[in-house]
Regions:
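Active-site catalytic motif of lipid deacylating hydrolases and related acyltransferases
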Residues: 6-66
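Conserved hydrolase catalytic core segment
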Residues: 66-99
Length: 99
């Protein structure tokens, strides 16, 4: 397996969970990425509406200190498609996601 050290590029990763779940489902990914030196944030979406989930994700993106990879699982894919227009977003990753 090839790994990239964080001094070669983007250091921030934001993880967005799907519906009928919460951010705890990302714990293994969080542990793996932080062990490799990435700064990882897990969004805790309220799942009250699409707009509320996008707003929660945008608030997390506002706090990032540079280019960020935004990752969405399932319903989180729909959320990151909208939030992906944020100036800090360098790329989107869809994991079994809806667009």
């Amino acid at each position: 397996m090839s790994t990239t050290t964080t001094d070669q590029g983007i250091k921030n990763v934001v993880l967005v969970h799907g519906a009928f779940a919460d951010g705890s489902g990302w714990r293994g990914v969080y542990d793996n990425l932080t062990a490799r030196g990435y700064r990882v944030t897990i969004v805790q979406n309220p799942l009250t509406s699409f707009e509320d989930d996008v707003a929660a994700t945008t608030r997390v993106l506002d706090r990032q200190d540079g280019p960020t990879i935004l990752v969405g699982h399932s319903w989180g894919g729909t959320v990151i498609t909208e939030a992906g227009n944020h100036e800090n977003v360098a790329g989107l990753v869809y994991v079994s996601a809806l667009e």
